[in-house]
Amino acid sequence: MQRRTLATTGLALAAAAMLGLPGQAAAQETIKIGLIAPMSGNYARPGQVMKMGAELGIEDINAQGGIAALGGAKLELVVIDTGDTTEKAKNAAQRMVAEYPGLVAATGAYLSSFTLAVTEVTERANLPVLTLSYSDLLTQRGFKYIFQTSASSGSQASQSMPTLISLAENAGAKRPKTVAIITDNTAASISSVKRMKDDLLAPAGLELVVDEVFTPPLADATPLVQKLRATRPDMLFFLPTVISDAKLLLEKMNEFGLGQGKIPTVSFGIAIAEPDLLNTVSAEMVEGVIAVVANWGSKGHEAMIERLEERYGEPWMTQNAISTYGDMWILKAALEKAGKADREAVATAIRGLDEGPSPYYPGGELKFDETGRRVGAGLTIIQWQNGTPITVYPPELAVAGPIWPKN
């Protein structure tokens, strides 16, 4: 669909140039797109990877002619650092709307708690914001200028529960009957866990035997892992957001003889699959660990993954890179539809998008419902195999089959 749009608008531009219509033939000044994400502090790494995805997306769009409806105007990325606290994120959003009044749209802000704070500010400024954050609350506030490309935490939990049980049974393991939950208290994690406990565990025949919440950064994982050792659940739902917390928990599980598949471990979110996890945790320690994520570089993205590695040294393409890359194409489509670099027009255009399936997000369509959620947004299940987190579900994106750790 993007190719057809580019071809059509390219012909229109050529015709306009021949007819001497200066408004169509002359490119406008650059169109500024914001990326508001952590570039410093504890969460700097994910924010920097989001920047990589945005840069590649803008590079590709500009190389293919920019925004045809605006005379080939090029996109320009403006990066705003949220820092590493909710208060800093809110201040960054206030600074963004004050210092960059020409922004037509933005993407960000990584942690759901940051995105909740940022969008309180951007909503008042009528600035459309795309986000890969998970929390259900993001699109339950009646806001009109936030657009959630990821499946929400609750949706991911609903989709993943029967899928995980099927993966276990299809791999020849016994059907899980007991489950432990160890989670941090970030907004996305709490949203996922609430949905599990309220609506999903009992219908799936799962008994909750450990239910622990901690505040990052975690100082000592021993008390949490001791409860796992005492109960020996059939499955562990493991929801850290910070890599250092994941490291402490995995190390302690291995120390207590519970790691490397002895308790099948399922994480939600990408912290457990970040490349720099291997800087401090061995590949053997994470072998078999599964993660449910909203997006991942998968089958069909090989060329993009290769570019990311060549340009930035990234060994694989996490959600932060591919979703932010895709966001640039959403904003291009909206600008083409809007026909002007105006934030209100762009927001209206995003609400009206109906582009069918997207190559940059799993499941569903490039279309948003009245709350701002992407229609039919799916999920991706990845698993550490031989030192790399690879896609094992859905089948159309999988690069290998899942291996379910045996009890």
Please provide the spans of the model-predicted regions.
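Twin-arginine (Tat) signal peptide motif
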Residues: 1-11, 16-21
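Extracytosolic ligand-binding ectodomains
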Residues: 2-8, 27-407
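Sec/Tat signal peptide C-region and signal peptidase I cleavage site
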Residues: 21-27
